[in-house]
Amino acid sequence: FCACLTNNRPLSPRLFFFPFFLFIRKTHWAYADYKHVKELSSDWANVLQPIVGWSALGCNKDASDSTVWLGTEGSHTPLHQDTYGVNLVAQLHGRKKWLLFSPDETVNLYSTRIPYEESSVFSQVDVRAPNTSIYPLSAEAQPIEVTLEPGDILYVPKHWWHFVEALDTSLSVNVWVDTPDDAGDRAKEAIARVLVTSLA
């Protein structure tokens, strides 16, 4: 699949009908993000199991607990903060740029719950082109930049802000690991969900 996207042409007649091929790589990017392995075919877990050994890192998780992120060059996840757990990310194909910001930077990143997504707090700042006249404190934000290459694993601490962009056609998997103080954060998220759904 990754080779197919990189060449911008189908490798088999079956893939010709894949929706990504309706768009030109130079002007569009495609992102299959946040896809839970358990919801995909069982083949995904079988293929990933020997590659992604979360238990070797001390986690009580296996490949079926993972989430898949597959995208073309330029695909990205906007700057956000996960509200609970820590994040382990394994880069399997291609490269991804990560911009990480400490939770201490929250005031500089202008957090918002719009759009609402359970367990995510977004930043109003577009880190690719920050508008410092609207968000002046964003000029003070100090990111840590990391480029993940195949075989790399990144540990994202709890509540750290992150922006992620594929530098090439990219495949990565991640797993969220619970922390002892997640119960309180999950309760806050449940309250936020009730409030948001009551407004709909």
PLM regions and their residue ranges:
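N-terminal accessory scaffold of Fe(II)-dependent oxygenases
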Residues: 1-153, 161-200
